[in-house]
Amino acid sequence: MVVTRGDKFAGSSLACKSMIGANKMSGSHLHEVNNSRSHFPQTNWLKVAKAFECIPSLNKFMGSNFLYSLESQKLGRDREMAARSIENIAPVTVQTLARPQIEKAWCTLINLSINNTYLRPGITPAIDNDSTSRTSSTKGSTFKVTSNADGSFCAHNHPEHSQRSVRGTAKSIDSFSSSSVGDNKIIIDKVPRVNYEVRDSVTVTNGMEMPPIKNSAQLARPVEPREVSLGEIDYDDIMEIIDVDQIAMEHCPSTCTKQPSVSKFVDIFTSRREEEQGLPPEICSNCSHGIKLGLCPEASTHVEQMKDTLLAISNEILDNTYDLGPDHVEQLHQKRLLLKKQIQQLEILIHNKERKKSQCLVSIPSHNTQYETPQTTNLEVVYGQTDSPTHVKEQGRCVTDNWNMPRDYLVSKERYDISSGSEEREQSVSEVIDVTDTESSNDKKWTSSDFPWTKNLEVYNKLVFGNHSFRPNQREIINATMSGCDVFVLMPTGGGKSLTYQLPALLCAGITLVISPLVSLIQDQIMNLLQTNISAASLSAGMEWAEQLEILQELSSEKSKYKLLYVTPEKVAKSESLLRHLEILNSRSLLARFVIDEAHCVSQWGHDFRPDYQGLGVLKQKFPNIPMLALTATATTSVKEDVVQALGLVNCVVFRQSFNRPNLWYSVVPKTNKCLEDIDKFIRENHFDECGIIYCLSRMDCEKVTEALRVFGHKAAFYHGSMDPGKRAFVQKQWSKDEINIICATVAFGMGINKPDVRFVIHHSLPKSIEGYHQECGRAGRDGQRSSCVLYYSYTDYIRVKHMISQGGLGQGQMKMGYNCKASSGRMLETNTENLLRMVSYCENEVDCRRFLQLVHLGEKFDSTNCKNTCDNCSSSKILIDKDVTVIARQLVALVKLTGERFSSAHIVEIYRGSLNQSVKRNRQDTLHLHGAGKHLTKSEASRILHYLVTEDILAEGVKKSELYGSVSSLLKVNRSKAASLLSGGQSITMRFPSTIKVSKQSKSTANPAKVPLKQTTLPMAKAAPQDSNLSGILLTALKNLRTDIVKESPDLVMAYHIFGNATLKEISKRLPRTKEELLDINGLGKAKVSKYGDRLLETIDSTINDHYKTRPGSGKRRRDENVNPNVAEDDDPDWSASQSHKKVVKNKK
């Protein structure tokens, strides 16, 4: 028996008394037991309790009479005779304790106070006034009492459970004998043993009733001493015999109501029919179990299978868009739409069931608390003066909390309803909607100049943003969103997505809410807007409460200075306060539009899935009439459709721009042991002292590459997620301000970077997907200049990345899916693995154009001839030939089977090519008939064929990590379902390989287009400036120095590209503007920047020209003052014209 000290012995005292009494019975009272067979035991309980409390010692208790309470405890004829013989047993002789500590421990067990107050069902015990002080008391002890075969007892001390004092009468035992010196066991010797049919052990813990012994007692002969435990008592045996309802009725007849003896049963068939009628039509079809989908208990499994089928259909549409017939494609689209509806309806149904189940579980009190009502504490918050601390009254006592509460808290709290912490909101379930989208990239409707805002659009674009024209699709997107349409935009990095919502924000009344994934990206956008005198604000979890309140107050004002509000998706998902303010703004017609930046994060099939993005569907649910603009630079067809569905864009207009970046040069280079030396050589020969990013797989790789580049003489630093946030921010600031050239980073770096002059992006290891690789490469050359994208590939990196994916190291965020978390994690792992295999296939391909491989994956048709030798495959001088490798593929699959599917791909290649290394000999694989069958192949050719079998899922590659060395290795296994067709002759494999014949090498400039300058188009000047290349170079250097000085004078978050872009400085150095009016003709210089920095620019230009031509100083300034127009460009300013018109009207009225 295990007894735990605690405050809840009232419920278990009766069972405990019955058990102790059953150990020693008097045969003289058996006839009384038989006569009381028809009575209920509630009266006996009172007698037993009273007798138990009056016992002064154990000896008297063991010899006392006991009244049976249970039917099963009454003895039969044979057992009755055995029980009577107990009376003839001699009194027990108890020896004196040898150790006072053990005696003290045993007395502590016996002296436990027991509350014998009986409570009728539904009534909780009263709580003492001083229970608060006893709530968090010291740790107590647990004693385990076991009986030995010789009749002795053992008690073990376990100081684990908390203790509380309970009122009651104390019991004690006089003396005991110790088993051994220093042992914590207490042995009571020479006690005759009564053997019972009992089970394992009995435990009494805080707040739990101890059930009685299950079977009747039996007398047994003493055996050799061995430690056994008292049996566990079956609680069901008591409940089968005792009529609890009748006992409760007799104890409290005035407060209880008798229940009818006949139960009311529900017609389950009627209930099932009603449930079937309420099902949506999409899930009324029968599943594989022969049950309707909406009623099947395995609905979650069906959802997982449907999503797998949906992914397969999407891939089929994507991979075979140009090979399938239009009817087949339409059937696939219809099937995919039906699957989406079924999945969403089932997810809603399962979500509702899980919520009801959780509510039921919450409504049922736990076993430890259902018999006790905890003491509640009434809190009253008293607000005094705003500068004083907050006082909390808690039942008469005052608690002071040093909380710096802003002024006017009460007014602000009632008016704006803001809380200092994030408020969790129940995750909304998206409604099933029929989504239709219209491809409008070539729709002439949106290119029209008949819109009422066309003139202001062009004026603001020039004066505010300094743009003299729109980039492709910018005007069309702006016209569509300002017309009130929901718009989905697929535009490459550097295509000008930000202008499509910043310019409408200036022209439209109200606030534009922009949801952006990273705080760093938000800060970069706000700093850029501030340079153009556009007021914008942001709300994030890290901001001070008073600062958030101030921003929301300004947003709610009649004439708010803010036009754009930036928030993170987490803020929208978790802040009820923000939604309430949006509702207020919408009621006053001050909510203009929603903008979802990096919209591919919404989709689970996207390469950068963010769970909080899926909660953005609530915006369209709450504000259906507010237009939404979704922007992304990387999205496949399936991702686009998933995003549109998740955001609720019912009838959206889609603008798709080519993802081709003609200024980027792509190449894949074999990764060798001298990879770092190769990187140093590439940078020195092509981009020395220029800005670049090197992406690495792990933190260790980042630091190792950085250290090597520093040794080689480059200004480099590393950036990864394990760094201190302040250190990361400092490194990013150094790189953005050109204090360092190269940053070695993990994939956590880059999304919030808008640096235009990144000349190269190098991948030191394998990216996890083609979408991610395309986006990371897109961070190079945003200014339109030639830039390089180099990937160093090794199949070993594939093993490393796959292991990290399987361990969750490269996951896209933790799934918050509730009921189907495991299923979602499995699907996410499968999606990540498939994306990784596509990336391996991209790297292994030495034939096809790199642009073609990327763009076809993104759902865009691209003609390889338009590459113009800007990738390594197109610029290669190799002649390629097709080879049938079906026989080789069959041999490799058979070899994997022969070796027991226990070896890596590299080992299989060694065997196939006839290697006799120690590993092959040790495993006796040199005797296999396929050993050396591929000796005519080079190692790279055999490896490439084997890797192709892996990417085609004919061979599956498992990954394991060595616990001893920490290295990662792979094991090849045969996918028998996919390999059957190959082995049976139903499938053939043809691959391209380089021929041994080579053509003449092309010129160096063509082979390495990174060094070829991109032709720049410039607008003609009103007065042509003399062409002087030396002067242009000197002036460009002077202008960059001026920009550096301005950045040093500006706040920390202001970067060089916020002031002037490199393209803008180059245009100035070539065109040599001499007045502010001429500066406004430079692309990238708006009215605000000319007003801020115009004088300093012109002074720099004049001084440089004077120094170059040795002319008289000051002549330029006089010419500038003579040519300046005091009303320059103000006639085209709508705000200025409106103010002048207003003044004229007022003057006329006077």
Curated annotation (Swiss-Prot):
Its cofactor is Mg(2+); Mn(2+). Disulfide bonds: none annotated. SUPFAM superfamilies: HRDC-like (SSF47819), P-loop containing nucleoside triphosphate hydrolases (SSF52540). GO terms for biological process: cellular response to cold; DNA recombination; DNA repair; DNA replication. GO terms for molecular function: 3'-5' DNA helicase activity; ATP binding; ATP hydrolysis activity; DNA binding; metal ion binding. It comes from the Eukaryota. Mostly expressed in roots, seedlings, shoots, shoot apical mersitem, flowers, and siliques. Induction: Repressed by cold. This is ATP-dependent DNA helicase Q-like 4B. The gene is RECQL4B.
